[in-house]
Curated annotation (Swiss-Prot):
GO terms for molecular function: ATP binding; microtubule binding; plus-end-directed microtubule motor activity. It comes from Oryza sativa subsp. japonica. GO terms for biological process: microtubule-based movement; mitotic spindle assembly; spindle elongation. Residues 443-525 form a coiled coil. This is Kinesin-like protein KIN-5A. Residues 49-395 form the Kinesin motor domain. Keywords: ATP-binding, Coiled coil, Cytoplasm, Cytoskeleton, Microtubule, Motor protein, Nucleotide-binding. Pfam families: Kinesin. Residues 14-24 have a biased composition (Basic and acidic residues). ATP binds at G135, Q136, T137, G138, T139, G140, K141, T142. Residues 1-44 are annotated as: Disordered. Responsible for microtubule translocation. May be important for the organization of phragmoplast-specific arrays of microtubules. Plays an essential role in stabilizing the mitotic spindle. Required during mitotic cytokinesis. SUPFAM superfamilies: P-loop containing nucleoside triphosphate hydrolases (SSF52540).
């Protein structure tokens, strides 16, 4: 069997030659032309740059022990490599930028996941991709591509040092198995050694070859297809079904690769190797047509360039190194020509560049892994590798997706291949055809010619052997005897042959029966396939529904993840807002506590001042009491003196009248007629005198009463002052206690509200977490509203309580101010009342003095009138009795003198009383003035104390207001601006009707019972026999059925 394969030729093509060519994507596909899914026209015209990855190996143990200087530094974050070079005692740093940079500490897994994994995914999308390692010998190319030498997995996992090839294989199988795709996979493994291509998967040759000069590994020809592509004729392909099989093939091929020990590498690869994986994946178009998607991955491990003088290569190793350097030099020239857009690119100068032609400037996606050494001893080779790799970045490929093939075209191609193989097998069985490769046939023809010449040379020896003919005749006689024996045996054998013919006839009958049974089985299989096709169609429909459902579930999960992320952000925001609110409330609490302490200090000072003021007022009140007591005593003594004087006047008047009465009675008899009129006048005069005396007594009594009332008013005024002062200070204490209680209530209410807010928030969060799994959509919609409403309510309550407490403080302050103003007004009113009482007392004293003067004047006038009357009576009665007149005159004179003395005593007593009253009033006024002065001083002190208290309370009010405003703004900012709300992305899947097949339709897909199928098949067979009369027509009808009946299984169904 002749197989030919190219590096980038995964698409099979039917051909008339004996063999199957796999050429680059874009060739004809056996008449099954389909639209190729290529990259956009803009990218196709512009091209895609070759991806270049740089990896620096770590220092070896020998380099570490010898303290070899490091001249390479890798910056993986900036994707740069810096090389330090000393020229003419001057340090020069050269920096190279690549697509990816991996330093000495990088892992195999990191390199694969970051750079190679996307390329493997593109292979599964239908692209041709090439990955090859390039660099100096001993820099880790083979380690990067294949790994540390062991591919045994632990618990299904690859070892940590597994390279690109095993990891790519594992990823391909994992993705295909996860997609439940139908696929087939083939691998090839070739080696390029000294410009000769060797198949590493070819079977081992015989130990004793026909031609002695034949080698163990036979070179294979490199052919061109005339369209710019190349392919390798006769390359062995292995069909693989698992990653383990590929690992075995890799181990098998790697064991055949040529390696040798040099001074730079203990196991240096002396050849280039190319491991290719071709994948055919079946997929369905939108019209339900089955297509084959083809992708190919080429994994190239290049031999490293080396300096012969430094590597120690001799003889054959030197020739190997020369061929390696020659091919790599050609690769460098190709890279330079592609970068410089040269008209001629020297692909044909080396087989390596011919094999990599499509990977460099062609239709393949290419990734170059450049490996370097950090040692100063390898600086020249390292700079060369960096220059070539940096130039290779500018190579532009134009990758295209391979054309998809129809399944029917692939099946047709496979049928033609099967027919060709059948013909070869038949020819081999009949031994009448050429069934070996053309090269082997030509080789055997040459061998036959050599043998003919040898026979001619031995013809001369035949005559010499004629002498042996006699001996041979004797042997012939012996053979005749043996022939007779054999004839007898032949008779027996013929008899056995007859028996065998009979058995063969029986076998033919059984064969016919078996053939009819096979036809029955084929009929049953046909019906089973028909049912299977219906089930497959139903399964495709269900798969489409499942994909839609999976997309919906993915959308729902993404929405849930987005909402969880927003909820986490909101939860952290609320926690941060809670801590900020707690800090601000602590600051506010400290401010209020400081203000309360200051208010307590001020109130304590005010209390001390008021205690001193009360003590001074007590002393002043005590002085007033003493002054009033003295005034009362003075007033009582004056009243007593007046009473005694009035009594003396009464007694004198009575004694005088008694004497006059006795004198008059003694003269009554004599003067009764004469003094009738005079007596009446005297009686009238005495009556008027008594009336005036009684009026004077009443006026004195009223004056004393007014004095008592004035003093009582002064005492009541002092008592009212004391009561007002005491009430003022008690009200101040009440207001201070109210302020303290309001502040404490404010603090307690705020703490309680914060605790309630925290409890409500925790309860709300707990309830949401419990209900989140049951009502995700509803809870996410209502969570924000409830939390916002809860926090707004709490903040509103805080605002209202702060406003209420502020208004309470303002009311208390205004109440204290009003009370202070009312105290001032009462104090002024008391001063006015005191002055008014003083003026009334002074007026009363003056009026009493004037009344007493008038009474005295009236008494004097009346006394004068009485004297005149008595003189007139004396003159008129002189004639009546001179002696009586003298006695009466003496009596009257005595009475007048007594009255005058009494009047003088009364005047002196009144003046003395008035003077004492004036003195007492002045003392009382001086004490009142001193008390007023003390009261004014106390009011000034209270005002000086109240003013800073008022200022501090105003500052506390402003600070409290600003703090509350700040808390409100922070809360509003946190809950209105920073609090995230899940905005609809319009990507949530809508409710739709899922088309589920009914149980009846599913039951209709079931294949009928085996007995019923046989019964129907036999009835149709009997009807055909009756119509045609033989079985031949029936067989022709059966052979005319579609090929799917005789060959029911699709050749590309995965059997893993």
């Amino acid at each position: 069997m002749d197989r030919r394969i190219g590096l980038t030729s995964p698409s099979p093509k039917s051909t008339e030659k004996s063999g199957r060519d796999l050429r680059s994507g874009g060739d004809a596909n056996g008449g099954a032309n389909t639209n190729s899914n290529s990259i956009p026209r803009g990218d196709k015209e512009k091209g895609v740059n070759v991806q270049v990855i740089l990896r620096c190996r770590p220092m070896s143990d020998e380099e570490t022990k010898s303290n070899t200087p490091v001249v390479i530094s890798c910056n993986e974050r900036r994707r740069e490599v810096a090389a330090t070079q000393i020229i003419a005692n001057k340090q020069i740093d050269r920096t190279f930028a690549f697509d990816k940079v991996f330093g000495p500490a990088s892992k195999q897994k990191d390199l694969f996941e970051q750079s190679i994994s996307p390329i493997v995914n593109e292979v599964l999308e239908g692209y041709n991709c090439t990955i090859f390692a390039y660099g100096q010998t001993g820099t880790g190319k083979t380690y990067t591509m294949e790994g540390g030498g062991t591919r045994k997995t632990k618990n299904g996992e690859l070892p940590t040092d597994a390279g690109v090839i095993p990891r790519a294989v594992r990823q391909i199988f994992d993705i295909l198995e996860a997609q439940c795709a139908e696929y087939s996979m083939k691998v090839t493994f070739l080696e390029l050694y000294n410009e000769e291509i060797t198949d590493l998967l070819a079977p081992e040759e015989p130990k004793f070859p026909i031609v002695p000069e034949d080698k163990t590994k036979k070179p294979i020809a490199l052919m061109e297809d005339g369209k710019g592509g190349v392919f390798v004729r006769g390359l062995e392909e292995e069909v693989v079904y698992s990653a383990g099989e590929i690992y075995k093939i890799l181990d098998k091929g790697s064991a055949k690769r040529r390696t040798a020990e040099t001074l730079l590498n203990k196991q240096s690869s002396r050849s280039h190797s190319i491991f290719s994986i071709t994948i055919h994946i079946k997929e369905l178009t939108h019209e339900g047509e089955e297509m084959i998607k083809i992708g190919k991955l080429n994994l190239v491990d290049l031999a490293g360039s080396e300096n012969i003088s430094r590597s120690g290569a001799r003889d054959g190793r030197a020739r190997e190194a020369g061929e390696i350097n020659k091919s790599l030099l050609t690769l460098g020239r190709v890279i330079n020509a592609l970068v410089e857009h040269s008209g001629h690119v020297p692909y044909r100068d080396s087989k390596l560049t011919r094999l990599l032609r499509d990977s460099l400037g062609g239709k393949t996606k290419t990734c170059i892994i450049a490996t370097i050494s950090p040692s100063v001893y390898c600086l020249e080779e390292t700079l060369s590798t960096l220059d070539y790799a940096h130039r290779a970045k500018n190579i532009k490929n134009k990758p295209e997706v391979n054309q998809r093939m129809m399944k029917s075209a692939v099946i047709k191609d496979l049928y033609s291949e099967i027919d060709r193989l059948k013909q070869e097998v038949f020819a081999a069985r009949e031994k009448n055809g050429i069934y070996i490769p053309r090269e082997r046939y030509l080789q055997e023809e040459a061998e036959k010619k050599a043998m003919t010449e040898k026979i001619e040379r031995l013809g001369a020896d035949l005559e010499a052997r004629d002498k042996q003919l006699v001996e041979l005749k004797e042997l012939y006689d012996a053979e005749q005897l043996l022939s007779a024996e054999l004839s007898e045996k032949l008779g027996k054998t013929q008899k056995d042959l007859e028996d065998t013919k009979n058995v063969l006839h029986d076998l033919e009958e059984k064969y016919n029966e078996a053939e009819s049974t096979i036809k029955e089985k084929e009929y049953v299989i046909f019906n089973l396939l028909k049912s299977e096709k219906s089930l497959v169609d139903c399964a495709y429909n269900l798969r489409a529904e499942l994909e839609n459902a999976a997309a919906d579930v993915s959308g729902l999960f993404s929405k849930i993840e987005r909402k969880d992320k927003i909820e986490d952000g909101n939860r952290s925001l609320v926690q941060r807002f809670r801590s900020q609110l707690t800090n601000q409330l602590d600051t506010l609490h400290k401010t209020v506590s400081t203000s309360v302490m200051q208010q307590e200090n001020h109130l304590k000072e005010m209390e001390d001042d008021m205690q001193s003021f009360v003590s001074s007022k007590d002393e002043a009140a005590q002085g007033l009491r003493e002054s009033i007591q003295k005034l009362k005593l003075l007033h009582g003594s004056g009243i007593t003196a007046l009473d005694s004087l009035a009594g003396e006047i009464d007694m004198n008047s009575q004694s005088t009248f008694e004497r006059l009465n006795s004198q008059v009675q003694s003269h009554t008899s004599s003067l009764e007629q004469c003094f009738g009129g005079i007596a009446s006048e005297a009686d009238n005069l005495l009556n008027e005198l008594q009336c005036s005396l009684s009026k004077q007594e009443e006026r004195l009594t009223q004056f004393a009463k007014k004095q008592r009332e004035g003093h009582l008013r002064a005492v009541e005024a002092s008592r009212s002052i004391s009561k007002i002062t005491a009430g003022f200070f008690s009200s101040l204490d009440v207001h201070a206690s109210k302020l303290t209680s309001i502040l404490e209530e404010t603090q307690s209410v705020q703490d309680q509200q914060l605790l309630d807010l925290e409890k409500k928030f925790e309860e709300c969060a707990a309830n949401e977490e419990k209900q989140l799994l049951e009502k995700v959509a509803e809870m996410l919609a209502s969570s924000h509203a409830r939390k916002k409403k809860l926090v707004q309510t709490a903040v509103g309550n805080l605002r209202e309580s702060a406003v209420n407490r502020t208004s309470h403080l303002q009311n208390e302050i205004s109440t204290a101010q009003d009370f202070t103003s009312s105290v001032r007004e009462k104090w002024g009113f008391y001063m006015e009342e005191t002055e008014k009482n003083y003026i009334e007392d002074t007026t009363a004293v003056d009026s009493g003095r004037s009344c007493l003067a008038e009474v005295l004047v009236e008494c004097k006038a009346k006394t004068t009138m009485g004297a005149q009357q008595w003189k007139n009576a004396e003159d008129s009665l002189f004639s009546l009795g001179k002696g009586n007149v003298e006695s009466a005159d003496s009596i009257v004179r005595t009475g007048t003198e007594a009255n005058q003395s009494l009047r003088s005593k009364l005047s002196s007593a009144v003046s003395t009383t008035l003077e004492e009253i004036d003195i007492a009033n002045k003392a009382l006024l001086s004490s009142i003035d001193s008390s007023l002065k003390l009261d004014h001083d106390a009011c000034a002190n209270i005002g000086s104390i109240i003013k800073p208290c008022h200022e501090e309370i105003s500052e506390l009010k402003g600070g409290h207001y600003h703090r509350v405003v700040e808390i409100t703004e922070n809360a509003g900012k946190c809950l209105e601006e920073e609090y995230l709300v899940d905005e609809p992305s319009c990507s949530t899947p809508r409710r739709r009707q899922i088309d589920l097949p009914s149980m009846e339709s599913i039951e209709q897909l079931r294949t009928p019972d085996y007995d019923e199928l046989l019964k129907s098949f036999r009835e149709s067979r009997a009807s055909l026999k009756q119509a045609n009369g033989d079985m031949k027509h029936f067989l022709e009808v059966q052979e005319a059925t579609p090929p799917s009946i005789t060959d029911p299984r699709a050749p590309l169904i995965a059997r893993n």
